[in-house]
Amino acid sequence: MSSYFVNPLYSKYKAAAAAAAAAGEAINPTYYDCHFAPEVGGRHAAAAAALQLYGNSAAGFPHAPPQAHAHPHPSPPPSGTGCGGREGRGQEYFHPGGGSPAAAYQAAPPPPPHPPPPPPPPPCGGIACHGEPAKFYGYDNLQRQPIFTTQQEAELVQYPDCKSSSGNIGEDPDHLNQSSSPSQMFPWMRPQAAPGRRRGRQTYSRFQTLELEKEFLFNPYLTRKRRIEVSHALALTERQVKIWFQNRRMKWKKENNKDKFPVSRQEVKDGETKKEAQELEEDRAEGLTN
């Protein structure tokens, strides 16, 4: 029952509640266990008295039923619990249309228990998954289409080692095309030297310079085998040894003003012996003439 209907007629409901109490229809005393229960109990008693007071007048109308419709109300706490609240959560009480107010509040039937959840299905849905990878969960596995065929895989670019592919910046990159795969080499793939940049000058230590000078005095021209030995002994590259000998031979020619450079030390000795022999012959010829 709405509070808008109860509050204006509270004085009449109070008188009707007193009349109902005198008639022997007492309200459940457990309503007054808590400090806020008298207000709730008084409202329920007033509502029950109003139904009895105005029920007969409402019965004269054909469209109105003789009894009020049922609507749920919160349950008062039992006498054993006091102000502690209800016995269980979710338990509600309903008020039927007829009967005394004390007997009208009955416990609603408990809701049916929820059925237990079904057991989880087996991982493979009853199908033996071990030994049958082709049909997992009852479905055929998808056939993967190869992205490349065997011929295309053979034609894929096989990148060489970075050290061998990079090479020196100043060297001709044509040999890179020969060593790499037969695929097309674009111009932007070739290593290019920076424009206007010169290679740094190589510096040699005193030990390296001394050993190179000794080798130059012994033989100004090195063979390929001897050049490899010298480069390994001095921790240099063959190119560095070759360039050093070229520069040293040019320096010797400028210092001696000679077009022909001695091939080896043996030729130098032979030249000296020839000069000495010529001088001796000249001295003998002078002695005979005198």
UniProtKB/Swiss-Prot annotation:
It comes from the Eukaryota. It is found in: Nucleus. Its main location: nucleus. Residues 108-124 have a biased composition (Pro residues). Residues 255-278 have a biased composition (Basic and acidic residues). SMART domains: HOX. GO terms for molecular function: DNA-binding transcription activator activity, RNA polymerase II-specific; DNA-binding transcription factor activity, RNA polymerase II-specific; RNA polymerase II transcription regulatory region sequence-specific DNA binding; sequence-specific double-stranded DNA binding. Residues 197-256 bind DNA. InterPro entries: Antp_homeobox_TF, HD, HD_metazoa, Homeobox_Antennapedia_CS, Homeobox_CS, Homeodomain-like_sf. GO terms for cellular component: chromatin; nucleus. Belongs to the Antp homeobox family. The keyword ATP-binding does not apply. GO terms for biological process: anterior/posterior axis specification, embryo; negative regulation of transcription by RNA polymerase II; positive regulation of transcription by RNA polymerase II; regulation of transcription by RNA polymerase II; skeletal system morphogenesis. Keywords: Developmental protein, DNA-binding, Homeobox, Nucleus, Transcription, Transcription regulation. Residues 60-127, 161-200, 255-290 are annotated as: Disordered. It comes from Homo sapiens (Human). This is Homeobox protein Hox-D8. It holds the Pfam family Homeodomain.
